Amino acid sequence: MENEIKGFMDYLAGEKGASKNTQLSYERDINQLKKYLEEKGITDVTRVTRTVLNSYVLYLEKEGRATTTISRMLASIKAFFHYEFREGVIKKDPAELLKAPKIEKKTPVILSVDEVNRLLAQPEGKTPKEIRDKAMLELLYATGIRVSELIGLKLDDINMNIGFITCRDERKERTVPFGKTAKKAMESYLDSARTILCGDQEQDHLFVNCNGSVMSRQGFWKILKHYGSLAGIEVDITPHTLRHSFAAHLISSGADMHAVQTMLGHSDLATTQMYMGYRQHTSNR
């Protein structure tokens, strides 16, 4: 299957223009299937049947894989076999009718306004690290961007005069405004903390760790957990919790649904509409 997988990866990179992360995800998923098939004595893509793929799904479930993970893996597998069928490598697509396990939609954790205020108040701003932490938390809540977008921001992506950031990936970009509180925290970080944290390193990323390197997702996750604990927040919070809270609080305040959709970068309005329940809940209190 090596040649078939390589051909599919070339197709993703070329014709589809898939991002590096997407390519890596597909390649990882398909190689895991390849390993399973080889253990079953199947090395030829033409020998893969729907029964074999169904057995693979059962295997993943027994391994304790999350339904969301299995669904993602199956999406990669379906795309691969559809490509092989389209190219005439196989006469029948064994993944065409393959069904992913049903995913239970979990209600997102949304902090109250009071909880958010307590969280944002934790970094006292006495050290360069605390000044940076304050800026990251304020900007994340003020914009609702993803943590990957936050740590991916570069100096050129922020306009302090007008008050907006530009989030980019390989295929699209969007601008998101931020308010006075976040602007003040950002000014403090840029004026008095970032240079100290960078030290001798030249760094074009906006947020850096204490060694002057790019802040990692895990690094920010630890920062958030630390301040969440100090704030006495009992629910398990993640960087996405602030994104959920940003959206829910905006909508509960009467913000336009389409405007919130644009700021969040949701391609489907239905994804943004899930926060309507929070508005109805708060209006009844």
Report each predicted region and the residues it spans.
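Conserved catalytic core of the tyrosine transesterase superfamily
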Residues: M1-R285
